Amino acid sequence: SMNRILPNGCLALVDPCTEVERDGLPYAVCVNGYDATIKRVRKLNNGFVLEPDSTDPTYQSKVFNFNEPDTMAITIIGRVVFYVLPTDWEF
């Protein structure tokens, strides 16, 4: 879901932080305490938008508005600052 900036299978280096310091940058986030993902994150007044950066149009942004009672919890793990490709990755 992030193949425009992070090739599939790459290893991401995450700088730990607990807040979104700059809107639109890629962050590692945990959704509902279980699922971890990397997405571009934008802050809302009371929530977040997780945006894919993909060539595949089936990946869509997800809005997490904490004013709505059934919204899943979002935990910011950190900002993605670098990535590397595995040694067995083929071009």
Short names for language-model regions:
Residues 1-91:
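Acidic/glycine-rich C-terminal interaction modules and beta/coil loop segments
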